[in-house]
Amino acid sequence: MNGLYLPQRLSRRGFIQTAAAAGAALMLPGSVLAATASASPDLSGMPGVGAVGAGPKTPLVFGHRGASALRPEHTLASYAKAIADGADYIEPDLCSTRDGVLVARHEAFLSETTDVASHPEFASRKTRKTIDGETHEGWFVDDFTLAELKTLRAVERLPQYRPGSARYDGMFQVLTFEEIIDFTAAEAAARGRIIGLVPELKHSTYFASVGLPLEDRFLSILAAHDYTRRNPVQIQSFEVANLKYMRGKLGQRANLRLMQLVIAENVRPMDVAKAGGTLTFAQMCTPAGLRDIAQYADVVAPPTRALIPLKKDGSLDQTSSLVDDAHKVGLRVEPWTFRPENHFLAADFRNNAGDTARNEAGSIAEIKRYIATGMDGFFTDDPALGRAALA
């Protein structure tokens, strides 16, 4: 997951707002969130609501950074396409600007997904940083105010695989989390269906270290918007402490789930490493580790290959026990990320069109194989193909 002022022709005028963060009173636990809304609605039919195993078990489709196989990620166009293509949820990854505004970026590094390098006025901002163990040289979101970010334009991250998406380079600005909420609310009203949000708090330990902690800003935004008070929100993180903090603040609410992201490797979450802990992601994926996750989270989200690993030849192997192990302790399993190009598919689902070619049939077939594991939802760069796999 590991990732505008809006062109008039693509915006629904009159709903995009840049609301101020709510006051300290809205940072209280779930009781305040409840108090700011009217009587609790019946959420049983909403996407993402309901216990594991309850009701018809159709996996949820999460639009990964929107429909990022078809439009530049985290843009209005990407989210609009994901919604039009049937995503149950759309995903904004959240980073902080220098002035404390939460914006949708997959990582703090701006150079791969915006045209910042072409802005001479920002040349002096180029620097080198190591964030979550990765070192990059370029430009970073926390060195820019929101007003400065709004002068940049989004570009396609993977143009060699997604030339169709790259045609939209330069058309869209960086979105705030609040703009995404308002856009989602308007789309839900226009389409007559609930659309969930699955935001990820990115680099929490890093942002806290530079005086820009994400969590309370995030909570105040959830509380300030009627849509996020009432409708499905799944909150993701690769870290542990911030999810535990969220659980303490939010309590148990029917429309909210906490999602522990994991990788199936023997490395530590960043907050664990900083605190000198020894817990690794690999340990978190064991039955004992999953039991611990279930004490504070509702969902575990591993990479897809943790459910069905690859053989040495790149084809799919036998199904692992992860889904069954997670379900035994009451966790949903919602892996990431299905991508429709041959390069990203298991070898047994590729065609002969070349490594960079888009392969819709292969992608649908691969997703179907994973649906058979019993997973409860999945992230995909192309929600239309995810929806087709469920048909």
Residue positions per predicted region:
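N-terminal binding-site loop/beta-alpha segment at the start of enzyme catalytic domains
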Residues: K57-Y89
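Conserved, mostly hydrophobic/aromatic
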Residues: H64, A82, D93, L149, ...
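Catalytic domains of carbohydrate-active enzymes, especially glycoside hydrolases
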Residues: K81-L94, D292-V299
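Acidic helix-start/capping segments at beta-turn-to-alpha-helix junctions
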Residues: S96-R105
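C-terminal active-site rim and adjoining tail of enzyme catalytic domains
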Residues: F207-A208, K249, R253-A391
